[in-house]
Curated annotation (Swiss-Prot):
Residues 3-96 form the PTS EIIB type-2 domain. NCBIfam families: PRK10222.1 (NF007586). This is Ascorbate-specific PTS system EIIB component. Its EC number is 2.7.1.194. Its main location: cytoplasm. CDD domains: PTS_IIB_ascorbate. The gene is ulaB. The PTS EIIB type-2 domain is phosphorylated by phospho-EIIA on a cysteinyl residue. Then, it transfers the phosphoryl group to the sugar substrate concomitantly with the sugar uptake processed by the PTS EIIC type-2 domain.
C-alpha cells in the first residue's frame, strides 16, 4: 500500500505546491512508499477519498476535519523538512508502517 499525502494551503496554488515538492523529496529520501497531491483548503473535502494524511500550516490544519483512518498534520514551517519531517514520519510509522521500506 502507498501512503497518500495531501498538502493543503489557502489557495492551492503557492505554498501547497511547494510543500508537495518538499514532502515528496523528504519521503523519497526517507524510503517511504507515497504519493503527494495538493489543493486549496476549500477543496480538501472533495480530495479526502484519495488521501490518508493531510498536511497544512497550523492555522489551516485547525479548519480541517477528518474521520476514520485519516490524519491531519499541522506544521509551523511548511517548507522546512526539519519542521514537518518528524511530525509526518511519526504519523506514518504509527499508522502506516507497511509503507516504510
Amino acid at each position: 500500500m502507498t501512503v497518500r499525502i495531501l498538502a493543503v494551503c489557502g489557495n492551492g496554488q503557492g505554498s501547497s505546491m511547494i510543500m508537495k515538492m518538499k514532502v515528496d523529496q523528504f519521503l523519497t529520501q526517507s524510503n517511504i512508499d507515497h504519493t503527494v497531491n495538493s489543493c486549496a483548503v476549500g477543496e480538501y473535502k472533495s480530495e479526502l477519498s484519495g488521501a490518508d494524511i493531510i498536511i497544512a500550516s497550523t492555522h489551516i490544519a485547525g479548519e480541517i476535519s477528518v474521520t476514520g483512518n485519516k490524519y491531519v498534520v499541522g506544521v509551523r514551517n511548511m517548507l522546512s523538512p526539519a519542521d514537518f519531517g518528524p511530525k509526518l514520519l511519526e504519523v506514518i510509522k504509527e499508522h502506516f508502517p507497511q509503507d516504510v521500506k
